[in-house]
Amino acid sequence: PRLLDDGYKVTVLDLYLSGEDVFAHYHKHADLREVKGDLRNQETVALALDGCDAVIHLACISNDPSFELNPDLGKSINLDAFRPLVEKSIEAGANRFIYASSSSVYGIKDEKNVHEEMTLEPLTDYSRFKADCEQILLEYQSDDFTAVTIRPATVCGYAPRQRLDVVVNILTNLAYHKREITVFGGEQLRPNIHIQDMVEAYLVVLKAESHQVAGKIYNAGYENQPVRELAEAVKAVVGTDVNLITTPTDDNRSYHISSKKIADELGFVAKHTIKQAAQDLVDAFEKNLLPDSLTDERYFNIKRMQSSDLQ
């Protein structure tokens, strides 16, 4: 929607596994073209890319649990379809390709500020294939084709295509509807970014001069906060009556990234707080924009994949 609002002509290629009403408010927009299809179908990809001068590649089987349900399916979409997509983009005349990777490619680091030049140590196939795609994309960087990768933190807040299976959104959903949230451990750091800031990061990279971003990789996050602080921020928004329970855990892994590079080079700094993300969700709950938010499978990637016949 932001691209349309900014005057771009937009083509969306998607399977619409979460429903075909994601762009309900924009279906009749003159500058929106929707192509329902599979990324692995080269004819469909060529159709979608026709006339495009930039590609923002977001499509994948997202998160480790969903990927592990069917590793062969995950590999076919997340890795095998990637090089053909890049090549088809070049054939179609696109001159910029922005890849949504993941901050999980770093694995577990002891350093306080995990930056883009650090060695990648992905722990799962999902993360490993993200790292592989980054390297594939760099092979195609040229004066005529600007290749850029963003490694986002975990996205939070309200969106038309809503996920309620990521940490801030999970906490807010449970706090609002159950009036109780449980934190396991609590000192583990988790990087997050508000959906509006995430969109802004893509726009900044899209609009930047080629010489600024060609072949570059950028982290994009807001803050690295302990899970306990995330829960307290959610409670402060939802209500003091929310019961916050802390229990011990054997999983004390922390994830933390530095977003200094994208700030220094492109001037992008995330501005929306965790409390704002929680408030956006509360507003959506109160307006009944997210019905059956505890049970509807469309909000939970793994449940949606379990019920899908995608092969």
Where are the model-predicted features located?
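NAD(P)-dependent short-chain dehydrogenase/reductase
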Residues: 135-190, 195-206, 234-236
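C-terminal substrate-binding subdomain of Rossmann-fold SDR/epimerase-dehydratase oxidoreductases
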Residues: 179, 184-311
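Conserved catalytic-core motifs of eukaryotic protein kinase domains, centered on the activation segment
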Residues: 22-24, 65-72, 108-112, 160-161
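N-terminal Rossmann/SDR dinucleotide-binding element
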Residues: 1-54
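NAD(P)H-binding glycine-rich loop region in Rossmannoid oxidoreductase-like domains
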Residues: 39-77
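Conserved internal alpha-helix within the Rossmann fold of NAD(P)-dependent oxidoreductases
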Residues: 42, 82-85, 134, 202
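Glycine-rich NAD(P)-binding loop of the Rossmann-fold in SDR/ketoreductase-type enzymes
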Residues: 40, 70-84, 120, 124, ...
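Conserved Rossmann-fold NAD(P)-dependent oxidoreductase catalytic core, especially the SDR/UDP-sugar
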Residues: 57, 83-125
